[in-house]
Amino acid sequence: MTAQLSKKGEAWSARFNEPVSDLVKRYTASVFFDKRLAQVDIQGSLAHAEMLAHQNIISQEDHAEIRRGMAQILEEITAGKFEWLLDLEDVHLNIEKRLTELVGDAGKRLHTGRSRNDQVATDIRLYVRSEIDNIVGLLRDLRLALLDLAEQHADTILPGFTHMQVAQPITFGHHMLAYVEMFSRDAERMQDCRKRVNRLPLGAAALAGTTFPIDRERVAKTLGFDDVCHNSLDAVSDRDFAIEFCAAAALIMTHVSRMSEELVIWMSPRIGFIDIADRFCTGSSIMPQKKNPDVPELARGKTGRVNGHLIALLTLMKGQPLAYNKDNQEDKEPLFDTVDTVVDTLRIFADMATGITVKPDAMRAAALQGYATATDLADYLVKKGLPFRDAHEAVAHAVRACVDRGIDLSDLTLEEMQAFSKLIEADIFAVLTLEGSVAARNHVGGTAPQQVRAAIARHRAKLA
């Protein structure tokens, strides 16, 4: 029997006196979910083999055979013809077994100087790095779609809310830009996370390194890593990079969830600020009039799922002594599902943004309720010389009087306004318009249409 593959089938079974039970095989096998790593596993193995040949650890002939075998395996996997075997536990041993069938002893030499511990850590880093790049691109697509929506409605006025109460008038374009800012930070977090992902564990072997004269920097360069992991124990045992990725993903979904909540509220017939295209909605099996915003509702729900995966990974790592433990097999399903959920959500939201129909009249009507320009009246009095706290009190009395009469501030006559402050003059009526209110906030970060358009231009320049 060889160390690589015993007659009992496992790469390690020569040590044991009895076979592993079928129940344990099913319980411990990961192949039916970690086969997703097949391409990056092959990528890592080819880089490792090239280094072994360069260092004269294996022959050039063995290297050529390994390359030939791996090319065939990749073809079989791509064509869906590769036979994944439960008895072989995981993606690594399934590929190694097939390689050995194809090229003989050369395949058995591939694992020289490495362990599955550093092999899988490398695979996961390659996978996460690729998915980060994908997600950053999808965040760009979503931001561009939101910028288009913001540009179309740079002048469309709706009420801004605090505590779900009407606060001040804003523009819909400004509101969309808030989400553009959030998703921009999400992209930055992903890109920053990538720096810590992009370090090579391969060469750490099981936990202590290897006795072979390997060249880790060569492998790192081949695979596009910025550096190698500088401690072999740390390289194989920690999954903090995956946790960090999932934390950044959870924040993406949190921002998606906040946006979803608003879309659901805005689409409600009681509010009626927007409509969402039929292709993103469903109906009811009993109520024929219903049009349900299922996509934002489901995204809101899936956020809890992604948050749960983050907690699962944190809990997975918290009690493990160094170095590698079988616990870490449980890192993949939460990680994979996080990737799938975030990728699918970002794709559909970028598409859905093009299917949002804004209803400016409904938004404007809502902004005319709730005394949204009260702060503008207070600011007006301050500019006339009244201390802000006194201005605040005077306007509060005016609002109270309007509430009692069921009218808006702009419905008061000049004489009625002057009862609250003699500083009020005829120019107040221009201040109390919705357009005047938003136009007055003409500074960087403000809701004035001019600033909204400038912010859109800045974001477009960054995304170009």
UniProtKB/Swiss-Prot annotation:
Top class in the EC scheme: lyase
EC code: 4.3.2.1
Pfam family, one: ASL_C2
Alphabetic keyword roster: Amino-acid biosynthesis, Arginine biosynthesis, Cytoplasm, Lyase
Any GO molecular function: argininosuccinate lyase activity
Disulfide bonds: none
Record bears the keyword Lyase: yes
Known catalytic reactions: 2-(N(omega)-L-arginino)succinate = fumarate + L-arginine
Main location group: cytoplasm
Gene Ontology biological-process annotations: arginine biosynthetic process via ornithine; L-arginine biosynthetic process
Pathway field: Amino-acid biosynthesis; L-arginine biosynthesis; L-arginine from L-ornithine and carbamoyl phosphate: step 3/3
Record localization: Cytoplasm
Family: Belongs to the lyase 1 family. Argininosuccinate lyase subfamily.
Protein name: Argininosuccinate lyase
